[in-house]
Amino acid sequence: MRQRTIVCPLIQNDGCYLLCKMADNRGVFPGQWALSGGGVEPGERIEEALRREIREELGEQLILSDITPWTFRDDIRVKTYADGRQEEIYMIYLIFDCVSANRDICINDEFQDYAWVRPEEFALYDLNVATRHTLRLKGLL
């Protein structure tokens, strides 16, 4: 089984948290709402990976005014590729508290939508199990 280290930002702006709706045909949780993030590349430092993933998935315009390592956890997940192929992966999640100075987002094709959500509105979203777990750990759900 392949192992991946995943950097995952929990991005907050003015009391709202950024959620991204995964594309329907790919990813670890197709069609569900999630936190952004992705894998650390070989030779890449953790914060470099976090900033790269944010740029790739959320665009160049989002400005983070604060990044603080928060927690980690691990899990085994099934990733679905665009061609329908699936792979079981052991994932180590490194989760960061992030504060954004703005809400300027330009999502890539990994996502079909995004929303800035107040904690009391989380129940209105089909959150994937990993995101629900993270939000519970943070005391937001």
From Swiss-Prot:
Pfam families, per database record: NUDIX
Reported cofactor(s): Mg(2+)
Nudix box (motif): residue ranges: 38-59
GO molecular function, one term: magnesium ion binding
Keywords per UniProt: Hydrolase, Magnesium
Entry annotated with the keyword Transcription regulation: no
Ranges where the Nudix hydrolase domain occurs: 1-141
EC number: 3.6.1.9, 3.6.1.12, 3.6.1.-, 3.6.1.23
SUPFAM superfamilies in UniProt: Nudix
Catalytic reaction annotation: a ribonucleoside 5'-triphosphate + H2O = a ribonucleoside 5'-phosphate + diphosphate + H(+); a 2'-deoxyribonucleoside 5'-triphosphate + H2O = a 2'-deoxyribonucleoside 5'-phosphate + diphosphate + H(+); dUTP + H2O = dUMP + diphosphate + H(+); dTTP + H2O = dTMP + diphosphate + H(+)
Assigned protein family: Belongs to the Nudix hydrolase family. NudI subfamily.
Known role: Catalyzes the hydrolysis of nucleoside triphosphates, with a preference for pyrimidine deoxynucleoside triphosphates (dUTP, dTTP and dCTP).
Binding partners and assembly: Monomer.
Protein name according to UniProt: Nucleoside triphosphatase NudI
Species whose genome carries this gene: Salmonella arizonae (strain ATCC BAA-731 / CDC346-86 / RSK2980)
Lineage: Bacteria, Pseudomonadati, Pseudomonadota, Gammaproteobacteria, Enterobacterales
Gene: nudI
